[in-house]
Amino acid sequence: MSASPPSFLHSLKRLSLVTQIVIGLIAGIALALLAPEVAKSTTFIGKVFVSALKAVAPILVFVLVMASIANHKHGQETHIRPILVLYLLGTFAAAVVAVIASSLFPSALVLSTHDVAISAPGGITEVLQSLLLSVVDNPVSALMNANFIGILAWAIGMGVAIRHAGETTRTVLDDLSNGVTVIVRVVIRFAPLGIFGLVASTLATSGFNALLGYLHLLAVLIGCMLFVALVMNPLIVFWKIRRNPFPLVLTCLRESGITAFFTRSSAANIPVNLELSKRLGLHEDTYSVSIPLGATINMAGAAITITVLTLAAVHTLGIAVDLPTAVLLSVVAAICACGASGVAGGSLLLIPLACSLFGIPSEIAMQVVAVGFIIGVLQDSAETALNSSTDVLFTAAACMAQEDKAQAA
């Protein structure tokens, strides 16, 4: 009998993170149904998880962005410029789609705003002024106060400067980036417990209407991703190759998207995309560079996640959003998305940066991140499927357009 608990814990540990999150979600719902008073006491578990996310997010953004820029190879983009343009265009278009969808179908979240001062910006002018002041903030102050705009600015500046440093310095920075990533993975491993506490306490306190709110949010997210995959991306591909894009689009979704949906990792799907590119007869020197690069910067799904969840928080808090600010959010979301690769829940951890545009404090932004983890079982799978399938789709479109141009000449 004494061996049973360790055996059970060992079996639970061997399950995938997705399965553990589902178990945490179901357990939280069950506890809220069967023992609401006990469920309310699990608030502390959720608070610890959210606090851990708040702790790692600033240093994560700073180190990852700085290391990414510092280790970027000179001249790499010259071989794949048309594909790079498609990657950036597709990511920005996805953010715009998310802004429009969030305006048409606004989502409301259950957020705790007690003892938190919220100062909504008055318009694009005030947003830009605040943005500029955030950019020139002291780097130590930016890290301490989770000023993500300031963190991003200093990370970009330091990354550009360190590009001219010695190889040893850049290697150390890359190792530091890997170290931070390991810490983030440890925090993410506690997501099932954190989600259990958040779901149980939220449902016990706010009732099951909160869960219905998550379903609406998930529908908006998945709807945006389907629209981008089946409407926006085909339009971009048609603009590039000037013929029916759907055979290529459906092939990429079937051969790459389905695999990525279940692996939930763009990096893990790189071999699948390389093999598909080879079968499509694409130029090896092109796809061998563009596919790994796409897994890093082609993040349409991440742009949708960042935008929809940020605007859900904005709508919940009653903050008005004018058109110029919405456009600025699309740009920021696209830039943030490019830095979301390689980290579990990367797009969710960059939501506070987008929220800071609207004067939403880190305490509330991290509650939005926690909501993202609750719906992440489906959201992250759909996001990865869109991201990874689009890598090979845009690579194929650019190669086909180049071949057509060469034949015409």
Curated annotation (Swiss-Prot):
Keyword annotations from UniProtKB, A to Z: Amino-acid transport, Cell inner membrane, Cell membrane, Membrane, Symport, Transmembrane, Transmembrane helix, Transport
Catalysis performed (reactions): L-serine(in) + Na(+)(in) = L-serine(out) + Na(+)(out); L-threonine(in) + Na(+)(in) = L-threonine(out) + Na(+)(out)
Cellular location(s): Cell inner membrane
Alphabetized InterPro entries for the sequence: Na-dicarboxylate_symporter, Na:dicarbo_symporter_sf, Ser_Thr_transp_SstT
Residue ranges of the TM segments: 15-35, 49-69, 82-102, 142-162, 193-213, 218-238, 301-321, 331-351, 357-377
Residue runs in coiled coils: none
UniProt superkingdom: Bacteria
Keyword Lipid metabolism included in the entry's annotation: no
Membrane topology, as annotated: Multi-pass membrane protein
GO annotation, biological process: serine transport; threonine transport
GO terms for MF: neutral L-amino acid:sodium symporter activity
Xref: Pfam families: SDF
GO cellular component, as recorded: plasma membrane
Main location: membrane
Name this protein carries in UniProt: Serine/threonine transporter SstT
Organism: Pseudomonas fluorescens (strain ATCC BAA-477 / NRRL B-23932 / Pf-5)
